[in-house]
């Protein structure tokens, strides 16, 4: 089973992934986008720190995704895979600038049509997002602003709906333990864990 954990920056994905790794390190392959491969680490550095065009950014994300799918997802599709970000957020971010259908086709090409089978979306309200953003330094994506990030969040839901990928929406302003409990429920329901 291939599950994606999605959410905008500061939604708490990384915190949840670390908690899940501690519990399921022997049962789940944990990956992330961008930057899971050596190649991806270089791409991540460029995307978040260099001043590049939206089109160049899109193709860098696609290159990273293609490499991760080819080297880690494809050979392990028979196992449990949990990814911190995926094609869902890739399309959600890019559809602010590019056509949805074109993005789907580019991502199908990059992933050989391998998309997550289920998505967990951590959703933040505007006030919580504003507070959390005020507590950290911003990368190039976060610098695009509050309204941009809220739109991306809505786009993630739209992408799942349009691609007919089942998803669960979780309130990311809840406490860490409650969110973790809900995610573990999904894992126990969808993944074959020993």
From Swiss-Prot:
Reaction(s) catalysed (UniProt annotation):
dTMP + ATP = dTDP + ADP
Asked if the Swiss-Prot or TrEMBL record annotates the protein with the keyword Repeat, the reply is: no
Q: Does the keyword Translocase apply?
A: no
The record's annotation in InterPro entries points to: P-loop_NTPase (IPR027417), Thymidylate_kin-like_dom (IPR039430), Thymidylate_kinase (IPR018094)
Record-level GO BP terms:
dTDP biosynthetic process; dTTP biosynthetic process; dUDP biosynthetic process
Broad class of enzyme this protein falls into: transferase
Question: What family name appears in the similarity comment?
Answer: Belongs to the thymidylate kinase family.
- Relate the protein's function as given in its record: Phosphorylation of dTMP to form dTDP in both de novo and salvage pathways of dTTP synthesis.
The identity of this protein, by name, is: Thymidylate kinase
- The scientific name of the source species is Nautilia profundicola (strain ATCC BAA-1463 / DSM 18972 / AmH)
């Amino acid at each position: 089973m291939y599950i994606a954990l999605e959410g905008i920056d500061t939604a708490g994905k990384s915190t949840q992934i670390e908690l899940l790794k501690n519990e399921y390190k022997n049962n789940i392959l944990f990956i992330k986008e961008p930057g899971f491969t050596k190649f991806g680490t270089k791409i991540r550095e460029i995307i978040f720190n260099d001043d590049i065009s939206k089109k160049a950014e899109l193709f860098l994300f696609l290159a990273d995704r293609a490499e991760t799918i080819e080297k880690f997802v494809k050979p392990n599709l028979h196992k449990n895979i949990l990814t911190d970000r995926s094609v869902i957020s890739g399309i959600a971010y890019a559809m602010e600038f590019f056509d949805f259908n074109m993005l789907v086709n580019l991502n199908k090409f990059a992933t050989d049509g391998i998309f997550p089978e289920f998505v967990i979306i951590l959703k933040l309200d505007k006030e919580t997002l504003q507070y959390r953003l005020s507590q950290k330094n911003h990368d190039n994506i976060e610098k695009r602003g509050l309204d941009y990030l809220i739109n991306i969040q809505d786009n993630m839901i739209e992408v799942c709906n349009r691609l007919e990928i089942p998803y669960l929406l979780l309130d990311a302003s809840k406490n860490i333990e409650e969110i973790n409990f809900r995610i573990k429920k999904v894992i126990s329901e969808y993944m074959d864990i020993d």
